[in-house]
A protein has these predicted regions:
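Divalent-cation-assisted or electrostatically stabilized phosphate/pyrophosphate-binding catalytic cores
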Residues: 245
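Metal-cofactor-binding active-site regions of metalloenzymes
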Residues: 2-230, 250-259, 263-328
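Extended alpha-helical solenoid scaffold regions that build the rod-like backbones
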Residues: 227, 234, 238-240
């Protein structure tokens, strides 16, 4: 078994980068939900880093949290981005926060730039919901469609759902999309898709868990077809049971609709059935991904690696830190 640590394949980039807006201060380069969650975990003042807090307060909170975030992949990504954007700046630290801020804002006043201009070279992937406009992304960012955002809320005609799905897929294709993320929650139960029952379910304002699972299965089938047509990679995030995951994959393997897949294992102790399915399905390219966030402690992560290596003795398993921010 060969494990390879790899960068996260999509990211929760801040709006200034996602929308390629003019940058006025360094905090705009990393102020986003995933970083905010980290700062809250380090006991940052919620008022200081909330929506009503100042950008300088946010930057200061990040600097103060650095000792707590030592070795954290997200924090390292932010520091790398700041070093790339301001190569001659002082070191980022709580002691230097005011000096760094003054230097960086001064540079941005002298040389105005947009969010996309400060990204280091190389293509990266940005997770986007269906309602977003991927065309606003900088050219160095390729959109990854978060498929669950295509699930209809309330009543909808099947024709309208298909038309809206096709519109979104076309927009993402035009923006250079190569991958679709498809989360499957612990509540998902495999229900074989049936056009008649799908149409009936779409007419309902409220749906039972089984009816919601039916629509999820139908949407998964639609994403399989799209990925095959565009030669995209489908990335199911299986938080459901192994039996449900294998039932879903087997259904579309039999119909010939299953594309190349890359999936996250989650808790490997409950994944033997899914791992064996991967091992014995050579006609489909299945690549498990271990999420570093599933076992943050090094000892637990090593044990998870060993367990997957024992259950999945062939092929290549990737390891992703998976914290939601880009890793350069």
């Amino acid at each position: 078994m060969t494990f390879s640590r790899q960068m996260a394949e999509w990211a929760c980039f801040p709006d200034a980068i996602r929308q390629n807006r003019p940058i006025t201060n360094p905090a705009e380069l990393f102020r986003c939900r995933s970083v905010t969650e980290l700062l809250l975990a380090c006991d940052a003042d919620r008022r200081e880093i909330g929506d009503n807090g100042s950008d300088y307060g946010y930057f200061s909170a990040f600097c103060e949290a650095l000792p707590c975030l030592a070795g954290n992949a997200t924090a390292e990504s932010v520091l790398h981005l700041l070093r790339f954007a301001f190569p001659e700046s002082p070191e980022v630290s709580f002691e230097n926060r005011t000096v760094f801020w003054t230097y960086a804002t001064g540079k941005l006043m002298e040389h105005p730039c947009r969010g996309g201009d400060v990204l280091p070279p190389g293509t990266r992937y940005c997770l986007c919901r269906a309602e977003e406009t991927p065309a606003t992304l900088p050219k160095t960012l390729l959109p990854v469609l978060s498929a669950e955002s295509l699930l209809p809320e309330g009543r909808m005609l099947p024709e309208k759902w298909e038309k809206e799905t096709e519109r979104v897929l076309s927009a993402f294709s035009a923006a250079g999309c190569e991958k679709i993320l498809f989360p499957l929650s612990a509540e998902y139960r495999f229900v074989r898709p049936d056009p008649y029952h799908v149409a009936l379910t779409l007419q309902k304002e409220r749906r039972t868990p089984e009816e919601q699972s039916l629509l999820i299965t139908q949407l998964f089938r639609r994403m399989c077809i799209a990925c095959k047509a565009h030669n995209w990679l489908l990335i199911p995030d299986f938080r459901c049971g192994s039996q449900e995951a294998v039932g879903l994959l087997s259904c579309f393997l039999r119909t010939g609709e299953l594309p190349s897949l890359c999936w996250s294992t989650g808790d490997v102790s409950t994944r033997s059935q899914l791992l064996q399915f991967s091992l014995h399905t050579p006609e489909v390219s299945l690549r498990p991904v271990l999420l570093r966030s599933d076992a943050p402690e090094e000892t637990a992560f090593s044990a998870m690696q060993a367990q997957v290596a024992a259950q999945y003795p062939a092929g290549r398993t990737c390891v992703s830190t998976g914290y939601g921010f880009p890793f350069f």
